[in-house]
From Swiss-Prot:
GO terms for biological process: protein import. Keywords: Cell inner membrane, Cell membrane, Membrane, Protein transport, Transmembrane, Transmembrane helix, Transport. It is found in: Cell inner membrane. This is Putative biopolymer transport protein ExbB-like 2. Belongs to the ExbB/TolQ family. Involved in the TonB-dependent energy-dependent transport of various receptor-bound substrates. Protects ExbD from proteolytic degradation and functionally stabilizes TonB. Its main location: membrane. InterPro entries: ExbB/TolQ_transport, MotA_ExbB_proton_chnl. It comes from Synechocystis sp. (strain ATCC 27184 / PCC 6803 / Kazusa). Coiled coil: none annotated. Pfam families: MotA_ExbB (PF01618).
Length: 227
């Protein structure tokens, strides 16, 4: 049975199921491409920014700006570009940037959730409509005769839409769970990298505060005053 025959025998519900399958495949391909880039580049990008921040804070900002097409770089850039922030402000900037980037990384999840929920229901609807059509032609006097053979065939064809809906939902659910696992792993990476950057900044901030207290270096506020 070729795809065209399946569409014809599956009934009217096969057309919305076809649209959902196309939407599911396109979303899965886009997410696979996105996560492939994230997995390959995140650790390398984060290590380069952290290593640079340990040596030169200004250079680390430029490195993060050059790599800001990656979520991890956008996350680290948010607190890095603040002018002399208090450690608490630095921490809040990290948290806010993490929330923004992690939310963007879940793009497409709602589409897959809708497909997972709708596909079986549409398949079941197609089966019910097919059964109604098949059984409506049966008369009590036809029971046990050869005329009921077509009804049996019609019931079998009516189940095609249910099978199609389940297949779409199962495939979408499998990839949805994979993407969820990748997202949770990335959340742990964000937490680890953010903590390392915060430690580096607190160490830098306290060293500068000690220098200000000793009178060796003018404070940032004093540097900003007109001469």
């Amino acid at each position: 049975m070729n795809p065209i025959e399946l569409m014809q025998k599956g009934g009217v519900a096969m057309w919305p199921l076809l649209l959902l399958s196309i939407l599911s495949v396109s979303t899965i391909i886009e997410r696979l491409w996105f996560w492939g880039q994230v997995i390959l580049k995140s650790s390398q990008t984060a290590s380069r920014i952290l290593d640079t921040a340990a040596r030169d804070w200004d250079t680390a900002i430029r490195v993060a700006q050059d790599s800001r097409r990656f979520p991890i770089a956008k996350y680290l850039l948010a607190p890095l570009r603040l002018p002399h922030p208090d450690p608490e402000v630095f921490h809040l900037a990290l948290e806010s940037a993490a929330d923004d980037q992690l939310a963007l990384m879940r793009r497409g999840d709602k589409i897959l959730e809708a497909i997972i929920a709708l596909s079986p229901l549409l398949g079941l609807l197609g089966t019910v409509l097919g059964l109604i059509q098949s059984l409506s032609s049966i008369q009590i006097s036809d029971l046990g005769t050869a005329s009921t053979a077509g009804v049996t065939l019609g019931i079998g064809e009516a189940l095609i839409s249910t099978a199609a809906g389940l297949i779409i939902a199962i495939v979408s659910l499998a990839f949805y769970r994979v993407f969820q696992g990748l997202w949770f792993n990335q959340m742990r990476v964000f937490r680890k990298v953010g903590s390392e950057l915060e430690v580096l900044y607190r160490q830098r901030w306290f060293e500068e505060e000690m220098a200000y207290d000793d009178g060796l270096t003018p404070s940032p506020e004093a540097e900003s005053l007109p001469q």
